[in-house]
């Protein structure tokens, strides 16, 4: 009787001291629903890995492994990423496609299969995020990483890629009843859409950007399929403002529909878009250099760069960056103002320029407040004069307003009971 190629002979333990290999030469694997065929020597090519422990010929573990209905060895992991694990087991190298979005998950799979060399190959980008090579602010350390955005330095960005437009849109709805009702439901925003250049969108929104609809696009390409993971519109505005963007245009369309024919409640739905723009001067290379480099701080502090934009930068002026090619994390910074007298000279620098700009801003605000109070006093006086109208003028105005009212000959659509009552009352 001939045996098939997948069958193996049974050796009783009493006849020999060594246990023969119970695995076939070609092993069939079912990894998360994906079927793989590979050699047994490939699975045990790296000692002390998880696959080496599972398929090692030193111990008879073939009967202990889980199998599917067709007898294939089942591994409950990501079937799509397992192909890169097999590639690494074959020749100790792994080649990923361009703009591969699953790099973090592949690293987690390598850690599960106990492949330390593969983990090292997948961690160069994350090693750059160490505290020694970054310039962190106090806000980022306390925010648990939810609002952290990784902004590339200006030296790595092309000159024509530091500016651009970003469009933020959302479709909102709200339910409003009659005037004076307190149980009206306010704005609901199911999703905030982001359109623009991919590199700009990632720079502003970072990890809060959902890229599942366009995962493999190059950073210099444009997209209109991104959306944010949160639903607070004002939070998106704050993130855009911190990165130097300002709104240049907006539009909105509103439609209303009745809930039913017996009530006056309406559901208002709207689609609104806000267009933000960042000029090249608002994100010049001197912004991060003034905050991160001590050598160029004095020269660039005396230049014509706007100091108000420096307050939105994330790097503290007293921290140092190790190299100009490193990445910088952006976020708000709280700075303490130093009290200095007028009789001693002050060396100009970025911190002093920021203080001067804050003083100018406060003085401008004081002028606007005083001018606004004067205008309000003048307007109140004019209103008082208008209120002192005579009774005859008020009656004449009421008569003119009454003459302007035009009652239609007939009402074609009677949607509400009060319309029919009005017609009966005036015999129309």
UniProtKB/Swiss-Prot annotation:
Subunit structure: Homopentamer; forms an open pentamer. In contrast to other BTB domain-containing proteins, does not interact with CUL3. Interacts as a tetramer with GABRB1 and GABRB2.
Signal peptide stretch: none
Listed name of the protein: BTB/POZ domain-containing protein KCTD16
One BP term from GO: protein homooligomerization
Chain ranges of the BTB domain: 25-98
Keywords, in A-Z order: Cell membrane, Cell projection, Membrane, Phosphoprotein, Postsynaptic cell membrane, Synapse
Principal subcellular localization: membrane
């Amino acid at each position: 009787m001939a045996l098939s190629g997948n069958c193996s002979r049974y050796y009783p333990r009493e006849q020999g001291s060594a246990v023969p290999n119970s695995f076939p030469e070609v092993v069939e694997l079912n990894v998360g629903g994906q079927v793989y065929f590979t050699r047994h020597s490939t699975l045990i090519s790296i000692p002390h890995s998880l696959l080496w422990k599972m398929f090692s010929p030193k111990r008879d573990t073939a009967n202990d492994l889980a199998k599917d209905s067709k007898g294939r060895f089942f591994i409950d992991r990501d079937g799509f990423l397992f192909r890169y694990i097999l590639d690494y087991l074959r020749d100790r190298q792994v080649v990923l496609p361009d703009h591969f979005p699953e790099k973090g998950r592949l690293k987690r799979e390598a850690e599960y299969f106990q492949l330390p060399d593969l983990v090292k190959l997948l961690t160069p980008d994350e090693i750059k995020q160490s505290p020694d090579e970054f310039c962190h602010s106090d806000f980022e350390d306390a925010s648990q990483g939810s609002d952290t955005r990784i902004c590339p330095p200006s030296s790595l960005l092309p000159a024509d890629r530091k500016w651009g437009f970003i469009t933020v849109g959302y479709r909102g709805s709200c339910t409003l009843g009659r005037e004076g009702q307190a149980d009206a439901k306010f704005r609901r925003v199911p999703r905030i859409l982001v359109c623009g250049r991919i590199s700009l969108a990632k720079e502003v929104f970072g990890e809060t950007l959902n890229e599942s609809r366009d995962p493999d696009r190059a950073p210099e390409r444009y997209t209109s399929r991104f959306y944010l993971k949160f639903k607070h519109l004002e939070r998106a505005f704050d993130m855009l403002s911190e990165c130097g963007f300002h709104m240049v245009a907006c539009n909105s369309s509103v439609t209303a529909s009745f809930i039913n024919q017996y009530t006056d409640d309406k559901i208002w739905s709207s689609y609104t878009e806000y267009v933000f723009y960042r000029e090249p001067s608002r994100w010049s290379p001197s912004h991060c250099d003034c905050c991160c480099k001590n050598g160029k701080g004095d020269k660039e502090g005396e230049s014509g760069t706007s100091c108000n934009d420096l307050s939105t930068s994330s790097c503290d002026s007293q921290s140092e960056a190790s190299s100009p090619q490193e990445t910088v994390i952006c976020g708000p910074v709280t700075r303490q103002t130093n009290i200095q007298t007028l009789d001693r000279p002050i060396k100009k620098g970025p911190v002093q320029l920021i203080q001067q700009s804050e003083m100018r801003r406060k003085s401008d605000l004081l002028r606007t407040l005083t001018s606004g109070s004067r205008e309000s006093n003048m307007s109140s006086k004019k209103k008082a004069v208008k209120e002192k109208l005579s009774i005859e003028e008020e009656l004449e105005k009421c008569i003119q307003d009454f003459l302007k009212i035009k009652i239609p000959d007939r009402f074609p659509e009677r949607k509400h009971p009060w319309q029919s009552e009005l017609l009966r009352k005036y015999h129309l």
